[in-house]
């Protein structure tokens, strides 16, 4: 028996001391008000008549039978943290699109996490609960709208998953039917060959060669059809991509950073030194001879518009 099975057998109800060894169908339940365990029989015995105080010594919480449920996690602290986070996420359910900036959304998430942390570790619980209730009261309409939108998105996602599963199932069934038809065709060809060999007076070798050629023709036709359908789908996807955007990418929005004094053509000048350097393995990544040539040209023409005499006259006048 594994550790989990041994743990379940050894579990006991803290109130009546019943265990799973004598009662394999025993269920241990918890209430999210205090997370104290007790068996289903004790819950029925204590809380059937109405709300009552938790029978665990030192706990003064008033519990209701409708809120008891089975524990999901072995650690009660983790169980409580998950419940707190579910409750807070249902109230603070705003999305990033509802904020003017990313910083405002991050501040909102930080505030929500602080409130969640305080409730999980019981820090300023009364003050934190008051903030949560005040927020829920002030944003009741937006909370309901966001919940409805989330539910609609979940429904759409579930419908898409169902549709995808249905399409996969139909594709599998179609493949099985096609495989069965192909198998039946092959059996018919084999039976026809046997029949011709038994009843016909023709040369058996010619009959076998004819059947082999027919099989090859069928295989070629099937492969051609599959290739055509595959190429058609590829061409369709390519056409759709081209139709979406035919504008070439330009990082400068079409602007060209050229010079009005010269034009550069890499085919009219041969630089033997840089040609040799460009083939070195350490300069492969990002090294271009054109950049070196353009830099030299820009340096040569950079002062061509500089009017020294006009500048001297301005200095004398000042």
Swiss-Prot record:
Chief location category: cytoplasm
One GO cellular component term noted in the UniProt record for this chain: nucleus
MF GO annotations: cyclin-dependent protein serine/threonine kinase activator activity; RNA polymerase II general transcription initiation factor activity; ubiquitin protein ligase activity; zinc ion binding
Source superkingdom: Eukaryota
InterPro entries xref list: Cdk-activating_kinase_MAT1_cen (IPR015877), MAT1/Tfb3 (IPR004575), Znf_RING (IPR001841), Znf_RING/FYVE/PHD (IPR013083), Znf_RING_CS (IPR017907)
Subcellular location(s) per record: Cytoplasm; Nucleus
One Gene Ontology biological process: transcription initiation at RNA polymerase II promoter
Function: Acts as a component of the general transcription and DNA repair factor IIH (TFIIH or factor B), which is essential for both basal and activated transcription, and is involved in nucleotide excision repair (NER) of damaged DNA. TFIIH has CTD kinase activity and DNA-dependent ATPase activity, and is essential for polymerase II transcription.
Binding partners and assembly: One of the nine subunits forming the core-TFIIH basal transcription factor. Also interacts with skp1 and with the mcs2-mcs6 complex.
Name listed for the protein in its UniProt record: RNA polymerase II transcription factor B subunit 3
UniProt organism field: Schizosaccharomyces pombe (strain 972 / ATCC 24843)
Species lineage: Eukaryota, Fungi, Dikarya, Ascomycota, Taphrinomycotina
């Amino acid at each position: 028996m594994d550790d989990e099975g041994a743990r379940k057998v050894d579990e006991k109800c803290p109130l009546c001391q019943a265990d799973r060894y004598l009662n394999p169908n025993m269920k241990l339940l918890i209430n999210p008000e205090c997370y104290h365990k007790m068996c289903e029989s004790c819950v029925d015995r204590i809380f059937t008549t109405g709300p009552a105080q938790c029978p665990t010594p030192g706990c003064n919480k008033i519990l209701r039978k409708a809120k008891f449920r089975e524990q999901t996690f072995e650690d009660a602290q983790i169980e409580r943290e998950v419940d707190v986070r579910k409750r807070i996420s249902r109230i603070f359910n705003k999305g990033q699109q509802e904020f003017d900036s990313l910083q405002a959304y991050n501040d909102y998430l930080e505030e929500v996490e602080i409130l969640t942390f305080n409730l999980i570790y019981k820090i300023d619980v009364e003050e934190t609960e008051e903030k949560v209730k005040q927020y829920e009261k002030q944003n009741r309409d937006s909370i309901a709208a966001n919940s409805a939108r989330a539910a609609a998105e979940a429904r759409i996602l579930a419908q898409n998953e169902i549709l995808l599963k249905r399409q996969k199932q139909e594709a599998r069934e179609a493949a099985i039917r096609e495989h069965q038809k192909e198998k039946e065709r092959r059996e018919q060809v084999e039976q026809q060959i046997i029949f011709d060999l038994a009843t016909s007076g023709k040369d058996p070798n010619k009959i076998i060669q004819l059947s082999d050629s027919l099989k090859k023709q069928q295989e070629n036709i099937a492969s051609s059809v599959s290739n055509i359908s595959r190429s058609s789908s590829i061409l369709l996807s390519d056409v759709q991509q081209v139709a979406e955007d035919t504008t070439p990418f330009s990082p400068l929005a079409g602007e060209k950073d050229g010079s009005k004094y010269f034009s550069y053509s890499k085919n009219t000048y041969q630089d033997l030194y840089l040609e040799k350097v460009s083939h070195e393995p350490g300069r492969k990544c990002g090294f271009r001879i054109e950049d070196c040539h353009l830099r030299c040209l820009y340096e040569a023409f950079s002062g061509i518009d500089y009017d020294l005499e006009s500048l001297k006259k301005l200095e004398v006048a000042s």
